[in-house]
Amino acid sequence: MPDPLIINDKIGRFKKVISVSGDKSISIRWVLLSSLAKGVSNAKNLLLSEDVLAAIRAVNILGIKSKITKKEVKIYGKGIKGYNYKKNITIDARNSGTLGRLILGLLINTTYPIKIIGDNSLSKRDFRRVTQPLSKFGAQFKLNKSKSLPLTIFGSQKLKSVKYIEKKGSAQCKSLSLIHI
């Protein structure tokens, strides 16, 4: 197993053009990461599937503005601590397991409890593979009996540094570990 990549320094400014074909998983990750960036992120050729639109609605609920045109999508990120939302909000991941799981990494240090829901299909999927590692960082969750959606994340203002090894090779779990804030 290769040594882990450790990034000790924050990226001060990132201004590059990256060209990728429309892809659901990449598009969802772009929306979520753009919500964390400070300033405007632009994407052309973003796949505007129902899952990606659900991701855009999710960051809108968290206080991040967006603009969708025929040619591009803009996300107006406010930085890592830039989410501004009301108490008692619910984020609907619809049928997107990627959104339902990765959004938890963004909400790990949330101030107020946030409920995550999904459609019938997503509500049958086990979420422990992401709630367990995030719990080690200090987040708290209220899961239903089947350990699926709906769930509530309580987050933590006192996150812990942990050594976590992803044994199942899950791209979602790896992404989750990278984007938790």
Task: Give the predicted meaning of each segment.
Residues 1-179:
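Structural preference for solvent-exposed beta-strand-turn elements
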